[in-house]
Every structure is written in C-alpha cells, then in structure tokens.
A protein has these predicted regions:
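Short beta-strand scaffold segments in enzyme catalytic cores
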Residues: 61-66, 178-182, 198-200, 205-211
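Short, internal active-site loops enriched in acidic
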Residues: 122-127, 176-179, 341-344, 373-376
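ATP-binding/phosphotransfer module of carbohydrate and carboxylate kinases, centering on a glycine-rich
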Residues: 1-81, 85-115, 161, 186, ...
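Active-site nucleophile and cofactor-binding loops and adjacent substrate-binding regions
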Residues: 56, 143-148, 169-178, 198-201, ...
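Glycine-rich phosphate-binding loop and adjoining helix at the ATP-binding site
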Residues: 82-100, 125-197, 215-223, 227-234, ...
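Short beta-strand segments
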Residues: 55, 118-122, 173, 197-204, ...
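Short glycine-enriched loops at secondary-structure junctions
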Residues: 67-69, 119-126
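Acidic, glycine-rich loop-and-beta core segments that form the ion-binding/anion-interacting portion
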Residues: 210-262
Length: 387
C-alpha cells in the first residue's frame, strides 16, 4: 500500500482543519492560510470600459486589450502569449528580464489613449492601498532575483511605459481572484448570493472566497466602503494531514520545503514528481500531468494504478478544500468558478470532485461552472476598471 487512498473520514478531517486555518487567516496576519485581502468587492456584472491586461500564470504570460460591458466582454487585441521565463534551470532570472518579457507581449497594441492596467499575477502577493501588491514568495518552482518583498505592479508598469503605453491606473490581483471576478461578471445569479468560490487547479492551486468585512478582523473596515470583500486564500500553503512519505520526499527536494504542502499534493506541476518518488525513472516528471492521465487510461499494472490513485487523490483533496471553505459560507447554493489545466484537462477529474462534494456536504448544492478561456483577462479588467 502506498497510502494514496483517503477515506471519507480523513477527507472530513482535512476539510474541518482547513476551515479552522481559514478562520485563523481571516483574523490575523502570518497564518498558514494567508487570507490576503484584495480590497475588491464582487462585481455587479454591469461594469463597462476598456483596460490593458497582463496575465502571468505558472506556465504562460499573455497580454490583451479588453472591452467590458454588462455581463459580457471581449478581447479587442490579443491575447499575445509566450511561456513564462522561469529560471527553473540554471541561474535565476533578473527581475528586469522577467517583467520586461511580460511587457513585450503588449508591443503590437495601439497606444492611442491612456488605459488602466489590470495585472493578473498568480503568485502570493499582499495587496496595497495604491492597487499594487508586494510579492511574498515564489511558488510553482519559479526563481527570479530581486523581486521578493517588492511591489510587482510598478516594475511591469514601468516596462510598459518604456514601450510607449500610457497607464492611467493599476490594479494587481491574483489569478484565482481574477477568475472569480470574471466569472461573477459573466455568470452572476441571485440564487448564489455571495456564495462564490474561485478555484484554480492547473500548474498550481489556490482558492478565493467572499467574506463579510466584519469577519476580516485584520482589515481596517473604515478604509473600505463595501460590506464584503474577495479574499485570496493562498490555500496551496495548507498543510493537510494524511500525506505520505512520497509527498515528504517531493517537498524536501523542492525549492520551498515546508511550504505549499497542499499544492504539492494536488497540482499539476508536482503530481508527476510524486509519481516519480513512488516509481523512479518511469516517466520524466517535467512532462506534466497529462502523462499521468495517459498512463492511467492506456497503461497497465502498478504504474497505471498509481497514476490513477494520484489523480483521484488530487480531485478528492480539491473537493475537501472546497467543502472546507464552503463550511464558512451561509447555507445555500454555492457556485464554484473552476479553472485550470488539470481541473478540466483530466476527463474524470470534475466528476470525482462533484461526487466527493456530495459525500462531504450533502446538504449544499455545488454548481461547478466551466469558465471561458479568457475569464482571467475579463476579471483583471474588472479590477482595473474598479479604480
């Protein structure tokens, strides 16, 4: 036995512990679950206007000109995309190169008028009152020098301005928050109230939630006009019980041992490394999670079984995470605005999440919404236009 199969009781224990960790993060800084305030309310769905958007995730960086209108929007230019330079091999990247490469994706766009900038940045960062954010740590194996504990929006804005773009305002937000905002702009329904969860499960994983400001004890509510706020949980840093010695080995060999334990057990970047710890040399772990899907569906014997167990455990842990967050919400229908290459790329994944949610929280209806491909870009535009 490799310890990858989790019982319903173990999943309930994980969900309950996550609920506790989220409550601690809402109350105080420096907790395992960061619960980073965004100073953004849910959009009404009626926003309109144009914004320049840059979206940098764990795999790709892209730029677009976005035009929003009521409950919809489109890309007027782009997205222009390229692989994120990551510094995973060889020397770490310089910050100038990292941000300059992202700004280059906007080079073909017109520069006929100033536009607000929405920067979707999928790494842990603390929002600041001026719309920027301070990088807390790198995740997903990224290595960039000279950026930790510094603002990330300002250097991108400077690189864009060097290339002739006039920026009228700035808002930095996490990809999970952007996905949530964009999804609500497109799909908001009265039956959900404020019960929305943003979920990213691809190269990395994270959740975003919506909470009454009075629950955010660490936020000065006098400086924020709305009654509720979107919160970037940074849930990938949760340390769940019932992980295995193989998970411990992957963690110890990573560039951030002791952190992002949930992400390392669930997300697309790390699952092949866990497989490699169990069956060394069978696959190249850098080939990605699709290799595990192929092995499960087309392979044979112990290797196929382990690949299937890892993918199923990932989906069941993701469901435990959703149930743990939803336990802090009012009773009622809850929309999960899901995005990510693993979440939708494995044909069995979402159904496993649904089935596990029914086991964990049979009284609550979870509606899993498949997001549009451009939802992060629309969400970043929502944030930029909220200034």
């Amino acid at each position: 036995m490799n310890g990858l199969e989790l019982s319903l009781e173990q999943l309930r224990e994980i969900a309950d512990l996550l609920s506790q960790r989220i409550s601690q993060g809402l109350a105080r800084d420096g907790q395992e679950i960061g619960c980073l305030p965004t100073y953004l309310a849910l959009p009404s769905g009626k926003q309109s206007g144009k914004a320049l958007v840059v979206d940098t995730g764990g795999t790709n960086t892209r730029a677009a000109l976005v035009n929003l209108w009521s409950h919809d929007g489109k890309l007027e230019a782009g997205p222009n995309a390229r692989k994120v330079p990551d510094g995973r091999e060889g020397a770490p990247l310089s910050a100038d190169f990292f941000f300059g490469t992202q700004a280059e994706q906007a080079d073909p766009f017109p520069r006929d008028r100033p536009l607000p900038l929405g920067y979707c940045f999928s790494y842990p960062a603390q929002a600041t009152a001026d719309g920027d954010a301070i990088l807390l740590r790198w995740t997903k194996g990224l290595r960039v020098d000279g950026a930790l504990n510094e603002k990330v929006g300002k250097p991108l804005q400077e690189q864009l301005e060097k290339r002739g773009h006039a920026i009228s305002g700035l808002r930095v937000l996490n990809d999970t928050v952007a996905s949530l905002l964009g999804g609500v702009h497109l799909y908001a329904e009265p039956r959900y109230g404020q019960n929305y969860i943003g979920l990213i499960l691809g190269t990395g994983t994270n959740m975003a939630g919506v909470f009454p400001v009075k629950q955010l004890e660490k936020v000065d509510s006098g400086a924020y006009p709305s009654k509720s706020m979107v919160v970037n949980l940074e849930s990938g840093n949760f340390s769940p019980p019932h992980l295995t010695a193989y998970d411990d080995a992957v963690d110890a060999a990573s560039n951030n041992p002791g952190f992002q334990r949930f992400e390392k057990a669930v997300s697309g970047h790390y699952l092949p490394y866990v497989f490699n710890a169990i069956h060394p040399g069978v696959i190249n772990p850098e080939a990605g999670t699709q290799k595990l899907v192929e092995l499960r569906d087309q392979g044979q014997g112990e290797h196929a079984r382990t690949a299937g167990q890892l993918l199923e455990r990932s989906a069941r842990l993701a469901a435990a995470g959703l149930a743990g967050l939803a336990a802090l919400y009012p009773a009622g229908d809850t929309a999960v605005l899901g995005e990510g290459s693993l979440f939708w790329g494995d044909p069995r994944f979402v159904e496993t999440v649904r089935a596990t949610l029914k086991e964990l929280d049979p009284e609550r209806h979870f509606e899993i919404v498949k997001q549009r491909d451009d939802v992060n870009l629309l969400g970043a535009a929502c944030a930029a236009l909220a200034n």
